[in-house]
Swiss-Prot record:
Coiled coil: none annotated. Its cofactor is Mg(2+). GO terms for cellular component: mitochondrial inner membrane; mitochondrial matrix; mitochondrion. Keywords: Amino-acid biosynthesis, Histidine biosynthesis, Hydrolase, Magnesium, Membrane, Methionine biosynthesis, Mitochondrion, Mitochondrion inner membrane, Multifunctional enzyme, NAD, One-carbon metabolism, Oxidoreductase, Purine biosynthesis. Widely expressed. InterPro entries: Aminoacid_DH-like_N_sf (IPR046346), NAD(P)-bd_dom_sf (IPR036291), THF_DH/CycHdrlase (IPR000672), THF_DH/CycHdrlase_cat_dom (IPR020630), THF_DH/CycHdrlase_CS (IPR020867), THF_DH/CycHdrlase_NAD-bd_dom (IPR020631). This is Bifunctional methylenetetrahydrofolate dehydrogenase/cyclohydrolase 2, mitochondrial. Its EC number is 1.5.1.15, 1.5.1.5, 3.5.4.9. Pathway: One-carbon metabolism; tetrahydrofolate interconversion.
Amino acid sequence: MATRARGLSLLRGRLGRGPARAPGVAERAWRGFGSSSRRHEAVIISGTEMAKQIRRELQQGVESWLALGNRRPHLSIILVGDNPASHTYVRNKIRAASAVGICSELIVKPKNVSQEELLDITDQLNMDPRVSGILVQLPLPDHVDERTICNGIAPEKDVDGFHIINIGRLCLDQHSLIPATASAVWEIIKRAGIETFGKNVVVAGRSKNVGMPIAMLLHTDGEHERPGGDATVTIAHRHTPREQLKAHTQLAEIIIVAAGIPGLITADMVREGATVIDVGINYVQDPVTGKTKLVGDVDFEAVKKKASFITPVPGGVGPMTVAMLLKNTLLAAKNITY
């Protein structure tokens, strides 16, 4: 009975306080990656600075891998069409890969390329021993089924983490190549020392590549093969009435927004001291300059006055997504995920 009572006592303590951790972990993380001009404003988490640290770690990892006599990690990127944003994203990925010692190649196809030709390309890359990771830049033209193409990539080379097997393993809390944006959000939370155990989390957005994987990472068991966040997660989407969304976000300690709606989350929807992670990517016209600018889904200037942590757009989740893609490429080269 004494053993059982002690076990129950420990469980109550864990449920009440979350797992113990060394004092000052969060504070050190704030100083390393965040800034706040005034004490009553949120710490702005710099994804740019955090990504720099991860790239340094990856560079060391690549050098250690090569020192053991292994082949240099190689990333093959397939780009379809002439979408300017896609070309910019791909250039950034190639530049970042080169900086950490990962070699890459770009395969460009016109927007009228057939689905069959794309599948032939992925088949060839799957069988190529020099290729560690394969990425198909999305979106694809309407006549090409994205799910079919993503599933055409070998799971062990699927550095975007979109293959049905990788998504399935993620849902089962098993090791897999995790979608890069979801992995970026999870890494930001961990490196900033933000507690998730038993916390209320709202994920606004249910896309299969971003919102759903984020929710899976945050709600799953922290003691499983692939540890999760042990949070209580509510998923909202475009059909969630605004007042209902507001009711959920006002209760949430962590709000993650990946809906693609500028200004979706306003200050009145956020509780004091919440963590707000903005995954949104929206191009809008600046009313003052008339120029196009990049914004997220959060009213940043207003919300930062209530939150404890907030990520900016640009300079938040975006740089971290590229860093986690490179991390997946190194994992794929080592072939240790499965």
